[in-house]
C-alpha cells in the first residue's frame, strides 16, 4: 500500500509539474485576453450600454452574439500576434526559419486549432462576464479558471477514473498541447471544443442573460 501510495503521489506531482511548466508558455497570451474580455465587456453593464441598446429594440441574443463575435476577432488577433512574434524571435535569436520542417497542411491546421482554442477561451470569459456583470469579479473568476481549472478537472478525472476524458476538452491547456506536426489530428477536437463552448457556455448563459433583469 505504501508503494502504491508513493507511486500515486509521484504521478500526481509529475502532472502538477508538467502543468505549471506548460502553463507559463500559454499564460502570456491567455491572461491578457481574459483581462481584456472581463474589463471591456463589463463596461457595457457599468455604463448602461446594454440597457440602452435593449431599450432601442435590439434583441438580447443579437447583442450577446455580437459581443461574442468581437471576442472571437480579438482572440484571433491575440493568437496571430503571438504566433508571428514567436516566429520572428526564433529567426532573430536562434536563426530558425520557423516552419520549413513541416507541411502546409500542418501549419494551416495548427493556426486553425489555436484560433479555435483562443476563441473558445474568449467565449467562456465573455459568457462569465454576462453572468457576473462585474469587471473585478469577472477578472478574478476567469483568472482562477486559468490557474486552477485544469488541476480541478484532472482531480475529478482521477477520482472518477476517467483518464484524460475531461481535460482533453479544456481549451486553455490545449493551447500548449497542440504541436504543429500533429495539428491535423487535433483539428477535429479543436472544432468540437469550440462549438461545445459556444453551445454550453454561450447557450446557457445567453439564455440566462435573455431572462434576467438588466436595470
Label each PLM-derived region with a short phrase.
Residues 1-40, 64-133, 142, 150-151, ...:
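Secretory targeting signals
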Residues 48-49, 123, 139-140:
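Transmembrane alpha-helix boundary/hinge residues in polytopic small-molecule transporters
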Residues 52-53, 63, 137-139:
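Alpha-helical transmembrane segments and their helix-entry boundary regions
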Residues 196-215:
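Junction motif at the cytosolic side of a transmembrane helix
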Amino acid at each position: 500500500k505504501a508503494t502504491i501510495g508513493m507511486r500515486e503521489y509521484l504521478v500526481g506531482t509529475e502532472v502538477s509539474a508538467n502543468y505549471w511548466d506548460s502553463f507559463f508558455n500559454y499564460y502570456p497570451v491567455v491572461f491578457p485576453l481574459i483581462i481584456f474580455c472581463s474589463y471591456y465587456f463589463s463596461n457595457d453593464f457599468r455604463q448602461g450600454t446594454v440597457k440602452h441598446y435593449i431599450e432601442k429594440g435590439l434583441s438580447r441574443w443579437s447583442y450577446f452574439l455580437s459581443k461574442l463575435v468581437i471576442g472571437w476577432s480579438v482572440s484571433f488577433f491575440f493568437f496571430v500576434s503571438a504566433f508571428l512574434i514567436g516566429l520572428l524571435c526564433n529567426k532573430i535569436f536562434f536563426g530558425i526559419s520557423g516552419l520549413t520542417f513541416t507541411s502546409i497542411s500542418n501549419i494551416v491546421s495548427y493556426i486553425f486549432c489555436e484560433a479555435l482554442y483562443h476563441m473558445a477561451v474568449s467565449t467562456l470569459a465573455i459568457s462569465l462576464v454576462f453572468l457576473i456583470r462585474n469587471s473585478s469579479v469577472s477578472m478574478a473568476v476567469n483568472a482562477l479558471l486559468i490557474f486552477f481549472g485544469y488541476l480541478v478537472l484532472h482531480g475529478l478525472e482521477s477520482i472518477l477514473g476517467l483518464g484524460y476524458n475531461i481535460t482533453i476538452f479544456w481549451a486553455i491547456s490545449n493551447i500548449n498541447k497542440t504541436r504543429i506536426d500533429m495539428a491535423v489530428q487535433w483539428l477535429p477536437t479543436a472544432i468540437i471544443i469550440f462549438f461545445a463552448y459556444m453551445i454550453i457556455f454561450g447557450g446557457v448563459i445567453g439564455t440566462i442573460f435573455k431572462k434576467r433583469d438588466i436595470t
